[in-house]
Structure formats: C-alpha cells, structure tokens
Amino acid sequence: MADQDVGSVYTTWGRKSCPAINGTKTVYTGITGGKPYHEMGGGVNTLCLPHDPDNAPSNFPTSQESAAHMYGSEYQFTYGNIAWDDDVPCAVCHLKSATSVLMIPAKTTCPSGWTMQYHGYLVTDNNDGAHNYWHAFDFICLHSDPNYLTEGARQHNMDGHILFPVTAVCGSLPCPPYKAGQYITCVVCSS
C-alpha cells in the first residue's frame, strides 16, 4: 500500500486551506456547492467542487432538458469577515496519521484520544416552509473563522445552494441541556 493511501480524508468547509495539524495536507481547494434550495429532487449532499473541473465529453448527455443543477453555496448570514451572499470556499484534506475523522455536532472539543482538526458551527439550508421548499439538505460543520471566495463578485446574490446557521428547537430535543434558539456548534476530530 502506498504512503498516500493511508489515512483519512475530510473537508474543511468555509476555508481556502486545510488546518496545519499533524501533517494534514491539502488535496485540493474548491467551491462549496450543491442543489439549489428552490428545486425539488436532486442530491442532498454538499460538495467541494474543484476550481479546475474536467469537462464531460460534448456528446454526453444528448439532452439537458432533465438535468439536475449544481450551484455554488452562499452564506445567508454575516459573521466575522464574511457577509451575506458571499460565496463559500472549501478544502479537501488528507490526514495521513489518522484512520478516522468524525464531525460531532453540539461540541467544540474532541473526546479523549481524538485530535481536533477544526471547530465551528452547523449550517444547512433553511427549510422554514415559508416558500413551500420542502426538501432535505445535509448539515455541515462550517469553520469558526470562515473565509469567502475572492473569485467573482462579492455578495452577488444567486440564491442557489444557500447556507444558514442552525439553532436548537426544544421539544424532542431536550432543553436543558440545549437552549431554544441557540446556535449549534460542531467540531471535526481525528483519531
């Protein structure tokens, strides 16, 4: 087995580079993307799309009438040095010294024996039902010190794949220890 095949791969959301922890290497940097919030169907996962895509052959597919759509992600909040509608960067990271990488919601520290790669806040699309956009999106851990993409125009509202911070709702989620309306943290840990 080659050296580069050992370890774990994870994505740092909201940053243009990987954390310099335990020999972490950047596999590639990219643009956070996913399906548009207003379209039914399609994928539910958020992707880190490379800056230098390889195009599909010109004869595939023969019709684009029934294609799913990929949009870049936009922040739908202001925090630190990012602003509403800024585009979201990402970096895919390889950690040779780890066999597992885990995102833990509602925590800012890792369990004993695990190493923190980064911590931040849960984000996802806002499915409040105000516009009848009932569909699924994944939750991702946005870095606590997020960047914005410098390519293109800042704060250009495309309203494609949009990211909102996540808050706790009491009921089946017990309060305490959770608090109604409180933003939910997250941490990415390796072992």
Annotate each predicted stretch with a short phrase.
Residues 2-191:
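Composition-driven recognition of glycine/serine/threonine/acidic- and proline-rich low-complexity segments
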